[in-house]
C-alpha cells in the first residue's frame, strides 16, 4: 500500500459510531517511531510507577495515622468532603492502588518529562483500536495488536465500566471496546457485585447520590475511591527534601533515580511564610509573591490545580507562565495562594519537548509532514503486583503549542520501537 492508501485504510476502519463525541484527529499512515532507548524506558517505567503509587498510598496512611510526616495527609485532603475522606481511609480498601497507570510523558531527546500521572484515563478504547488497526497493516506496535484489550479485561475481569455525564464524550470508545451492555451510567447505577472500572472523577462523587448511597468499601472498584492518590501534588512531594529517604526505601534507589530523571522539579504552592533566613529551593526566593515579578524567561514554569476540581483534568486549570503576560501570571499566582486551603496548586519546571516529525493524510489527500512535539502515553495494567504494558498512545501537536492534548490538528497514533523520529 502507498502511504495514502494506508491512511485511508485507517480512516475507513473507524467504528461507525466513532470513538469520541465530536472529536477528530489527523491520521498517520504509520505509527509514531520511538527510539529503542525510549521504548526500553517505557518497558522499565511501569513497575516503578506502580511502586510509586504504592508508596504514596503508604505515606498517606502513615501520615493520617500520625505515624510519620503528619503534614502530608492534611495537604492531600484539602477541599474534600469528610465522607469521601472516610471512605478513602476505610480498612477494606487500605492496600488498594490503581490498576491502570497512564503517565503523560513529554518526549525529550534523552528521555521523557512526566507532566501528570493519571489513574482514571481516557483513551483506552482508542488506543486498543489504533493498535488493532495498525497491526492489521503489518506494524509491530508496542504492546501488540491485543495488548490493550487483554490488559483492560485482565483488570476488569468481566465487569463493567461506570461512566459519568462529565466523561460521556469517552463513552463511544468504551462501548466499542466492551459492548454497550457493559458500559453503565454511574448516575443511575446500583452496585451488583460485578467488578467495575471507575470512569468518573472523585470530585463527581458527592453529586452521584444513588451510587453514594449504595456503594460500600470492599466492592471491587478500580481506580479505588482515594482522591488523595489522584493529586498532582505527589510530583512535588517526590522532590520534597524531608521525604527523600522514604522514597529511597519504598521504591528503591534505582527507581528513585529513574523518577528523578523524568519528573520535572516541582513545588507545592504553600502560602505559609518562611523564616527570614530560608529560601524556596531551586527558585532562590523567600516568598511565592516574588514570582509575580519574574521575567518571561524566569516564568518558564507551569502552574496547575492539583486535583479534586472540575478544572483539574485535561488542559483546564493549567497555566504556562512564559505564555502569559506579567499581569496574567501575577493574577494566577495570587489566586493559587488564596485558594490553597481548598484547591492547592503545584508548580513545575516547564518541560519543552524535542521536535519530532510524522506524516499524515491532509484533507486534500496529500501526505504532509508535521513537525511538532509529542506526548507519549503508555498504558500499564496491574494485576497482583504484576505490571503489563498494554499499548502506547502518541499525540503529536504543532510545535507552537505549549500544552499537548488531543485536538483537531494533532496526530494520534500508536507507537513502534524503531529508529529515532526526532530532528
Give a label for each model feature:
Residues 1-423:
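Preference for protein termini
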Amino acid at each position: 500500500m502507498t502511504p495514502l492508501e494506508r491512511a485511508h485504510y485507517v480512516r475507513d476502519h473507524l467504528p461507525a459510531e466513532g470513538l469520541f463525541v465530536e472529536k477528530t484527529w489527523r491520521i498517520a499512515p504509520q505509527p509514531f517511531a520511538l527510539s529503542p532507548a525510549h521504548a526500553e524506558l517505557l518497558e522499565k517505567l511501569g513497575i516503578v510507577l506502580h511502586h510509586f503509587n504504592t508508596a504514596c498510598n503508604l505515606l498517606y496512611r502513615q501520615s493520617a495515622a500520625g505515624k510519620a510526616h503528619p503534614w502530608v495527609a492534611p495537604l492531600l485532603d484539602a477541599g474534600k468532603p469528610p465522607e469521601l475522606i472516610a471512605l478513602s481511609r476505610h480498612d477494606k480498601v487500605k492496600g488498594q492502588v490503581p490498576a491502570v497507570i497512564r503517565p503523560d510523558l513529554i518526549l525529550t531527546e534523552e528521555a521523557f518529562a512526566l507532566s501528570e500521572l493519571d489513574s482514571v484515563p481516557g483513551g483506552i478504547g482508542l488506543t486498543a483500536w489504533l493498535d488493532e488497526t495498525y497491526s492489521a497493516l503489518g506494524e509491530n506496535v508496542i504492546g501488540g495488536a491485543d495488548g490493550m484489550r487483554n490488559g483492560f479485561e485482565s483488570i476488569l475481569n468481566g465487569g463493567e465500566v461506570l461512566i459519568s455525564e462529565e466523561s460521556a464524550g469517552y463513552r463511544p470508545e468504551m462501548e466499542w471496546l466492551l459492548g454497550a451492555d457493559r458500559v453503565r451510567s454511574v448516575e443511575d447505577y446500583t452496585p451488583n457485585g460485578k467488578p467495575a472500572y471507575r470512569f468518573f472523577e472523585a470530585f463527581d462523587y458527592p453529586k452521584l447520590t444513588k451510587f453514594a448511597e449504595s456503594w460500600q468499601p470492599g466492592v471491587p472498584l478500580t481506580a479505588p475511591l482515594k482522591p488523595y492518590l489522584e493529586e498532582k501534588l505527589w510530583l512535588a512531594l517526590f522532590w520534597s527534601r524531608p521525604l527523600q529517604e522514604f522514597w529511597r526505601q519504598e521504591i528503591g534507589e534505582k527507581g528513585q533515580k529513574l523518577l528523578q530523571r523524568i519528573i520535572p522539579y516541582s513545588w507545592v504552592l504553600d502560602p505559609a511564610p518562611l523564616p527570614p533566613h530560608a529560601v524556596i529551593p531551586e527558585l532562590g526566593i523567600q516568598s511565592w509573591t516574588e514570582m509575580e515579578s519574574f521575567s518571561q524567561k524566569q516564568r518558564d514554569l507551569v502552574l496547575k490545580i492539583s486535583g479534586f476540581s472540575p478544572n483539574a483534568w485535561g488542559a483546564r486549570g493549567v497555566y504556562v507562565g512564559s505564555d502569559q503576560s506579567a499581569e496574567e501570571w501575577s493574577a494566577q499566582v495570587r489566586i493559587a495562594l488564596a485558594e490553597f486551603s481548598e484547591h492547592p496548586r503545584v508548580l513545575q519546571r516547564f518541560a519543552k519537548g524535542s521536535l519530532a516529525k510524522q506524516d499524515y493524510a491532509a484533507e486534500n489527500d496529500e501526505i504532509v509532514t508535521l513537525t511538532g512535539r509529542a506526548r507519549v502515553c503508555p498504558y500499564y495494567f496491574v494485576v497482583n503486583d504484576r505490571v503489563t504494558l498494554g499499548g502506547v498512545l502518541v499525540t503529536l501537536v504543532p510545535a507552537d503549542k505549549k500544552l499537548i492534548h488531543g485536538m483537531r490538528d494533532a496526530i494520534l497514533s500508536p507507537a513502534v520501537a524503531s529508529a529515532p523520529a526526532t530532528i
